[in-house]
């Protein structure tokens, strides 16, 4: 018989830096999950990623207090800000442009995100990432 699902918890945790402090501790603690077990497993799974990049994670908590989790790729906005060398996007993206990204940078980001995107091919994924860049106030070259 399959385990009964008690809750889904969605968090963004920095790769390789999960610890019991907020937001991880309180979110897992209220469902009775072993926090240190999650932190060790998460840090082990994200070991190959660049440390400090936020990594979305979906934790499935079962009624017997066990859990499984699935990590996603880093959000496109974080990767775009890193590619453009920015700390934040534009407050008024339609009028104030704060940086520029090239098609090559967009392709690199699209390849990293392709598993989490609904795009049929790489070109569609690049267009999706380019739209995100424009909505952040970045100029897009070559698309």
UniProtKB/Swiss-Prot annotation:
InterPro entries membership: Ribosomal_uL11, Ribosomal_uL11_bac-typ, Ribosomal_uL11_C, Ribosomal_uL11_C_sf, Ribosomal_uL11_CS, Ribosomal_uL11_N, Ribosomal_uL11_N_sf
GO molecular function, one term: structural constituent of ribosome
SMART domains registered for this protein in UniProt: RL11
UniProt keyword 4Fe-4S, yes or no: no
Pfam family, one: Ribosomal_L11
RNA-binding is among the record's keywords: yes
The record's account of how the chain is modified after translation: One or more lysine residues are methylated.
Cellular component, GO annotation: cytosolic large ribosomal subunit
Keywords, in A-Z order: Methylation, Ribonucleoprotein, Ribosomal protein, RNA-binding, rRNA-binding
Disulfide cysteine pairs (residue numbers): none
GO biological processes: translation
PANTHER family in UniProt: 60S RIBOSOMAL PROTEIN L12, LARGE RIBOSOMAL SUBUNIT PROTEIN UL11M
Protein family: Belongs to the universal ribosomal protein uL11 family.
Function: Forms part of the ribosomal stalk which helps the ribosome interact with GTP-bound translation factors.
Subunit (UniProt): Part of the ribosomal stalk of the 50S ribosomal subunit. Interacts with L10 and the large rRNA to form the base of the stalk. L10 forms an elongated spine to which L12 dimers bind in a sequential fashion forming a multimeric L10(L12)X complex.
Protein name: Large ribosomal subunit protein uL11
Gene source species: Pseudomonas entomophila (strain L48)
């Amino acid at each position: 018989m399959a385990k009964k699902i008690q809750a889904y918890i969605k968090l963004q945790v920095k790769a390789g830096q999960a610890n019991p402090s907020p937001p991880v501790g309180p979110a897992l603690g209220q469902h009775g999950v072993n926090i240190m077990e999650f932190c060790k497993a998460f840090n082990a799974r994200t070991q190959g990623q660049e440390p400090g990049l936020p990594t979305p994670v979906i934790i499935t908590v079962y009624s017997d207090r066990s859990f499984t989790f699935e990590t996603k790729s880093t959000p496109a906005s974080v990767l775009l800000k890193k590619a453009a060398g920015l700390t934040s996007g534009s407050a008024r993206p339609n009028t104030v442009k704060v940086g520029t990204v090239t098609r090559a940078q967009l392709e690199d980001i699209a390849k990293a995100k392709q598993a989490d995107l609904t795009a049929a091919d790489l070109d569609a994924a690049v267009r999706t990432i380019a739209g995100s860049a424009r909505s952040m106030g970045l100029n897009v070259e070559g698309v």
